[in-house]
Structure formats: structure tokens, C-alpha cells
Amino acid sequence: MSSAIYLENYLDGLESLPTELERNFKLMRKLDDRAQTAMKSIDSHAKDFMRKLGENGAMSEDERRERQEDIKALFGKAKEYSDDKVQLAIQTYELVDKQIRRLDNDLARFEGEIQEKASSTRAKSEEVVAKKGRKKTKDSKTTGKKKKSASSDEETGRGNNQSNANSSVNSSSNAGQGSKKKKSKVNQEKETRKGGAQKKTVEVDDSEKESCHTAATHPSDVMDMPVDPNEPTYCLCHQVSYGEMIGCDNPDCPIEWFHFACVGLTTKPKGKWFCPKCTQDRKKK
């Protein structure tokens, strides 16, 4: 129920209250006047009774008893008027108290509804933040997998190119060695035919062997994959998103997302979580 409906219902209940209070106050005033009139009459009768009672032989026994009964009746009337006035005052008090209790109950009910709505809104807000955190973590994992896959493909391509280069170098080296060996054998046969000269052993150039061996056995180191300069950075380490991350529940947090390891977490904590900077700022307040 909205506050406007509460107010409207309460004003409807108060609409007849002034009329009832006015009627009760008028009756109380009339009863008070009657009681005061009775008390004045009692004073007058009492003075007259005491005056005649003081005179010797001025009042008979029957007259004295009659005057006493009259004074007693006046006292009864005054008491009746006073009792009616007290009852009417109690009734008026209960009438006002009823409206006050009704207002208190309506206010308590209205406050309960406000707190319930606030709790519901807070729960929905936390659920939205949690969903954003899970989505951010999922996107971070997907981005990390894509980067690893791209890096692996690039390393594989460079490895294949290096292998092809090494194979070409080895083939060239082997071909050179074969041709030189053939020349050596031809020269040796010629020397033998000419007069039995000693055979020459033709050695392959050591520098060529060393260069071929180095090219075949020491491929170039794989370079690190370059980082996209346009990718946003997070956390206290100012690095890109990777692995498990947690979001700060302070909506004004300048960093917003943090790596678990950088803030000393292994699992997501229950309830709200604030980063170290926001925690210090909250303590200062």
C-alpha cells in the first residue's frame, strides 16, 4: 500500500473526530455547570440549615430531617453530574487514543513495507552485480584461451618455417660436401694414373661446416606475443584481464575489477567485497 493510500485512509478516519470531540466537550461543559449549580445550592441549604439549627426551637425534628434529605439529594445530583463528566472524559480520551494507535500501526506497517522493498531492491542489485562478475570472468577466460590458441598457432608456424630453413641449409651443405668429395676422388685417380702420387684428402672448409651445424641445431628463439595496446587494463597490477577476477561492490571504484592473486583471494567471498583502496576510504569516513 502506498503512502498516499495510508494518508487518505487516516484522514477519512479523522474526518468525524472533530465533530465527536466537540460534542463530548459541550456535554462535559454542561455537566460541569450542573455540578457547580448543585454545589452552590448545597452551600445555600447548608448555611440556612445551620442558621436555623442554632436558633432554639426554630426547627422541629421532622423539618430538620427533611432539610438533611434535601442536602443529601443535592449531593447525589452533584456526584452524578461529576461521574457523568468523568465517564465522558474517559470516552473522549479513548477516542483520541484509538486514532493514535491506528496511526502508529499504519506507520509501522508502512515502514515494514519500505524496508521490504529496500531489501528486495538490494537483493536484485547484488544479483545483477554477481551476474556481471560471472560474465566478466567468463569473457576473461575466453579471451585468455583465444590468446593462447593464437600464440600456439604462431609458434607452430615459426617452427615449421625454421624447420624448412634448416632442411634447405642441410641439403645445400650435403650437396657441397658431395661435389667436393667427387672432385677429390677424381684428382686422386688422376694422380694415381700419372705416376702413383700420394692421394690427397680434400677437407671441407671448417667454417662452412660450423655455419651449417649452427643453423641446423640452434633455431631462433620464439618471441613473446605482442599485447594489444587497445585492450583495457585492470587490478592493482594494471594488467589485462586473465584468470579469476572479482568486482568491487563500490559503484565509484576507479579500478572495479581485480585478479584473485593480486588481492589475496583464492575463492569468491560471500556477501559484498570491497577492494583495499575502497576499504581504506570507508574506514576514513
Curated annotation (Swiss-Prot):
Biological-process GO terms, alphabetical: chromatin organization; regulation of DNA-templated transcription
Binding-site positions, Zn(2+) 2: C248, C253, C275, C278
Entries under PROSITE patterns matching the protein: ZF_PHD_1, ZF_PHD_2
Keyword Metal-binding: yes
Localization: Nucleus; Chromosome
Low complexity: bias regions: 160-178
SMART domains: ING, PHD
Superkingdom, taxonomy of origin: Eukaryota
Keywords associated with the record: Chromatin regulator, Chromosome, Metal-binding, Nucleus, Zinc, Zinc-finger
Binding site for Zn(2+) 1: C235, C237, H259, C262
Region entry Disordered, spans: 116-225
Ranges annotated as biased composition (Basic residues): 131-149
Pfam families assigned to the protein according to its UniProt record, in alphabetical order: ING
Gene Ontology MF terms in the entry: acetyltransferase activator activity; methylated histone binding; zinc ion binding
Zinc finger (PHD-type): 232-281
Annotated site residues (Histone H3K4me3 binding) in this chain: Y234, M245, D249, W257
Cellular component GO terms held in the UniProt record: MOZ/MORF histone acetyltransferase complex; nucleus
SUBUNIT field: Component of the Enok complex composed of at least Br140, enok, Eaf6 and Ing5.
Domain comment, as recorded: The PHD-type zinc finger mediates the binding to H3K4me3.
Function of the protein: Component of the Enok complex which has a histone H3 acetyltransferase activity.
Record-stated family: Belongs to the ING family.
PANTHER family reported for this sequence: INHIBITOR OF GROWTH PROTEIN, INHIBITOR OF GROWTH PROTEIN 5
This protein's name: Inhibitor of growth protein 5
Organism of origin: Drosophila melanogaster (Fruit fly)
Gene: Ing5
